Amino acid sequence: MKNHATRNPPRLGRSALAALLCLLCLAAPALAADFPLAVTDAKGRQVSVPRRPQRLVVLSGNAADALRILRATDLATGVTERIRENPVYWGSLAALPSVGKWNSPNLEAIAALRPDLVIGYGANPGPELEERLAPLGIPVLRLDLHRLHSLEAEMADLGRILGREAEASAYLEWHRAALARIRDLVGRAGTRPRAYVEGYSDFRVAGPGSGIDEMVRAAGCLNLAETMAIPFAEVTPEWVVAAAPQIVIKAVSGQRSYECADPGLLPRVRERILARPGWSLTPAARDGRVLVIASDLCPGTGAAAGVAHLAAFAHPEVAGRIDPGAVQREYLTRFLGLADQGCYVFAGARP
């Protein structure tokens, strides 16, 4: 007689099948997690994250925005004073315990919170952050999250670390599509207006290596400082006049722009620039082509909105096909969960 057992294996009962499915579901997170996880930080170093973080200390505003994008603010246990001082923008994050300044935090306060990961900028604080926290078993991950060339990789890495890959992918898909459309439109314009790009300090020009330089280039402009060897350099008024910029872009340090704490700030900055001695000789000043942009919007995770504003300003011929307000609105409402408001850009109309 033939043995039919191999053709008709015993079936699992409903209760046994349910139990098996439950075990598989419980095992799935363990199978998906690939820890320790090695990622490249903002300094190009390999950093090992030993396990999926459940308690984060956030020293960077850009990283705090990234947590909102990834729907992971519940993991934060400590923030800097700069975040605590602006509850209108930061919401519940501003109510978390303080660990001091973003560039010189209180390391004892960090240790007391028992974080399993600290996220800070690439350059600041200094190496003492790792030196003091490493003996306590607290890893430090340095992510700038404000440079176009590395923003996508850093967001993807943070999404993997926190188990928020889907949220990271949704943001990156939007970010890439927005920038691709802008680059296509300004590429068709066929012109690259000469731009004098000034950092937060007067006559401190932003060159290669600065976040704003990358954004200006993405907006289809020729940065007059693109041949300089350092990200920021001091220049003279004579240098600017001789360079004959067609447009001027001035970055202003974050001043609680979301709540528009000082509506007159950006107009005042622009007025002072136009009144500089000798600047009336430049094409930019003669034509009133001066734009002031707040760092609250860019550079950072909202870079696509900042590039949209810069491109529409620099290329009037295609401005009607670029809607900076729409890009900004989607960033604020869809990804940060905020209302569509703020004073971020001023180029001669209402902020």
Where are these regions (language model features)?
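Bacterial N-terminal signal peptides
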Residues: 16-27
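A short, structured surface patch at a secondary-structure boundary
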Residues: 55-113, 117-122
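A ligand-binding cleft/hinge motif common to bilobed small-molecule-binding domains
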Residues: 124-135, 252-273
